[in-house]
């Protein structure tokens, strides 16, 4: 296994533990409440290692490096911050440029909120949960901090019914009838 792959496995686990569903870009679904898209496409044919979405809107990027690469490098930070300004047109964003930047090599994790121009990267023990990001950014969305519904243990019809119910409420409907 390559060093990059080892770091990705650790980072995937960190994201999952925080409540993010990690998927490759071919399996992105805007219906998932908290999703980290691997190799997220950006403007100019660039790819963010992870593009973070809350309720179908991009909120930040996570730049992953192999364990031997220092994430304290200005080059790594500049690369990730460029990605925050490259949100493609097909993708909605909570803010543009994206406000949150994470850097990780699987061992260490740095974070910066780019809304504060002179802010510095700070070291974190874990990635923010979707609920913590909702509070941090002051997002006004009742569903943005909800955990992602997991398919495991549900029949396809149950998963589909619950997902459609959530989408109905997200769309502003205040009532729904669900029959299983």
PLM regions and their residue ranges:
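ATP-dependent helicase/translocase motor core
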Residues: 1-180
């Amino acid at each position: 296994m390559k060093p990059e792959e080892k770091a990705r496995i650790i980072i995937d686990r960190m994201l999952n533990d925080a409540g993010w569903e990690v998927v490759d870009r071919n399996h992105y679904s805007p219906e998932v409440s908290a999703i980290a898209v691997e190799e997220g496409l950006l403007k100019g044919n660039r790819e963010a290692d992870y593009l973070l979405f809350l309720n179908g809107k991009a909120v930040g990027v996570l730049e992953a490096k192999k364990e031997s690469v220092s994430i304290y490098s200005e080059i790594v930070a500049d690369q990730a911050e460029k990605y925050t300004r490259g949100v493609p047109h097909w993708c909605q964003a909570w803010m543009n440029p994206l406000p949150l930047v994470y850097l990780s090599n699987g061992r260490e994790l740095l974070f910066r909120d780019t809304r504060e121009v002179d802010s510095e990267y700070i070291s974190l023990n874990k990635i923010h949960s979707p609920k913590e990001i909702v509070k941090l950014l002051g997002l006004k969305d009742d569903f943005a901090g909800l955990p992602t519904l997991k398919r495991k243990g549900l029949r396809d019809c149950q998963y589909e019914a619950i997902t459609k119910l959530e989408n109905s409420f997200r769309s502003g409907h205040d009532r729904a009838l669900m029959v299983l």
